[in-house]
Amino acid sequence: MKFARFEINGWQSYGVVDGDHLRVIQGDIFGTHHFTDARYPISSVKILPPTMPKSFWAVGLNYADHVAHQVENLDAGFVSEAQEFRPWQKGVSCIIGQGETIVLPKESDYVHYEGELVIVIGKPARRVTPEEAPHFIMGYTCANDVSSEGSWHDDPSNWRKKTSDTFGPVGPWIETDLDPQGVEIITRVNGKETDRGSTSGMTFNCYETVSRISEFVTLHPGDLILTGAPGAVEG
């Protein structure tokens, strides 16, 4: 099932994708809700980010092939870091929906993109095991983890590099019936394929990721977790 958040004539709601239409949902998609008879053509609505989360997490260096593409120009410490679980947060204010414009900061020298699978949390999660994690995940969506480089290249924080306004396109919807263990991820720019990989190459899979973050932080319904980019990263 695919859940989409949308807007039409200034009114916002959730709907379930039914062919080329959205069937309107009444209630809380993370709690009690039901499907109504109201339907809108997808082409007639504005698709919004699937959630507006309390937190927007990300896992860095989570694919061996991604690390391999960069390791020639980096020191051995980079490889060591790639073997550790290193989550970080992207600012929720950077989130935009499908088709919205990514604004490039005038101060940046270089901007690049990373197509990633995103975990959507469905229930409050605290200290869950990897085996329990699927019960706390509502589904999955897609995101472009946009990054920029500039005079802040050596700044170890990501606040300028990763969290500028519009640097978090997410969507278009939440897929609830996806097995995350072997998903093919294809990134295209202007129709041209620039990267291809599989979630089977993750160092820390989706269930391990939820478990590890929830050891120290409560995850809430609607929270998003970027799971890393496979393959190379081109500008």
List PLM regions with ranges.
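A generic local secondary-structure boundary/capping motif
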Residues: 46-48, 75-77, 102-111, 125-132, ...
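Residue-level recognition of short, solvent-exposed, well-ordered loop/turn junctions
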Residues: 52, 97, 112-114, 220
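N-terminal non-catalytic cap/leader segment that marks the start of a structured domain
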Residues: 1-85, 178
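Catalytic-pocket segment enriched in acidic/His residues
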Residues: 46-50, 66, 149-235
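Short, charged beta-turn/beta-strand-edge "cap" motif at the junction between a beta-strand
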Residues: 9-11, 63, 124-126, 230-234
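Structural signature of FAD isoalloxazine-binding scaffolds in flavoprotein oxidoreductases
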Residues: 75-97, 113
